[in-house]
């Protein structure tokens, strides 16, 4: 079992990309780094003011994940001091909870010497998160496509796509469970077919590096965007502006409240500056997809 300190780095993620609802995830270049050292009691120290409202004791999601992961294998872990550095906006649709869960799994694996397989980590994370899209991308990096039920887990990975990314962050946070409450319980068979076709074509286009087609399909979602977009100021106006500046497509990042914009490579800074100027109540952040998922450094 680990005695000396170590660190874990986990990327931010976006999920869905429109019609890839609850099964498509993309790792992003924003990161959370956690330094773990032995301590007399669990204590989490956040270096970013945005995280100041989170628990700093055993009720913290990272610690709960560590303890629950170890307990699955009848192991207990010694208390740690966890120093957290993160540039991932909290509660803004960039997978902050999935990042915490992925980090907790990696820390438990290290502290208790669990020797978890990749599939073990993916199953644990997806069960804890309740869906697989964000946590698979956080653990594996690149782009992930997942099939997850109580009985089965399948994940395929793609390399990080050669695009730029702009995330439009509003001033308010949104809990995923609140956003999920906006969704209908049922879709008609005809609607489901249309949504499935858009998601399949988008994924195939991404695999073929055809981001023009992928961007169009990204905006054809019927599973969640029509119901969630009402909570976004200037949603349609922002989408029109994205088209004007040459973006491939725009959609909701995960469950929101941020927006995900795919743009041609090396244009993300320019597009972010233009959107920042036009929509000052949002914060436009330029970034790229991330190739690497969670990693441990000793």
Specify the residue positions occupied by each region the protein language model found.
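Glycine-rich, charge-dense phosphate/pyrophosphate-binding loop(s)
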Residues: 206-298
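Gly/Ser-rich oxyanion-binding loop with an adjacent helix/lid
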Residues: 76-152
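Short beta-strand-to-loop capping motifs
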Residues: 38, 170, 261-265
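ATP-binding N-lobe of GHMP and related small-molecule kinases
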Residues: 1-92, 106, 110, 114-116, ...
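Short beta-strand segments
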Residues: 9-11, 27, 138-141, 147, ...
């Amino acid at each position: 079992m680990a005695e000396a300190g170590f660190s874990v780095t986990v990327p931010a993620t976006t999920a869905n990309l429109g019609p890839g609802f609850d099964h498509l995830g993309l790792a992003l270049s924003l990161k959370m780094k956690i330094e773990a050292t032995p301590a007399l009691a669990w204590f989490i120290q956040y270096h970013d003011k945005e995280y100041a409202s989170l628990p700093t004791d055993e009720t913290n999601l990272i610690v709960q994940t560590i303890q629950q992961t170890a307990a699955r294998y009848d192991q207990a872990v010694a208390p740690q001091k966890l120093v957290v550095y993160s540039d991932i906006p909290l509660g803004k649709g960039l997978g902050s909870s999935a990042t915490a869960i992925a980090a907790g799994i990696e820390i438990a694996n290290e502290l208790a010497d669990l020797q978890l397989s990749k599939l073990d980590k993916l199953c644990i994370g997806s069960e804890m998160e309740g869906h697989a899209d964000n946590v698979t991308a956080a653990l594996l990096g690149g782009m992930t496509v997942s099939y997850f039920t109580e009985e089965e887990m399948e994940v395929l990975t793609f390399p990080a796509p050669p695009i730029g990314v702009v995330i439009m962050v509003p001033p308010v946070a949104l809990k995923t469970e609140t956003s999920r409450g906006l969704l209908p319980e049922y879709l008609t068979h005809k609607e489901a077919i249309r949504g499935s076709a858009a998601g399949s074509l988008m994924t195939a286009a991404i695999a073929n590096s055809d981001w023009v087609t992928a961007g169009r399909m990204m905006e054809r979602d019927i599973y969640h965007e029509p119901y969630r977009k009402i909570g976004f100021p200037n949603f349609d106006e922002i989408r029109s502006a994205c088209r004007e500046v040459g973006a491939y497509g725009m959609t909701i990042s995960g469950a929101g409240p941020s927006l995900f914009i795919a743009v041609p490579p090396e244009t993300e800074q320019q597009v972010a500056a233009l959107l920042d100027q036009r929509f000052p109540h949002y914060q436009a952040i330029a970034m790229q997809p991330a190739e690497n998922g969670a990693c441990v450094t000793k």
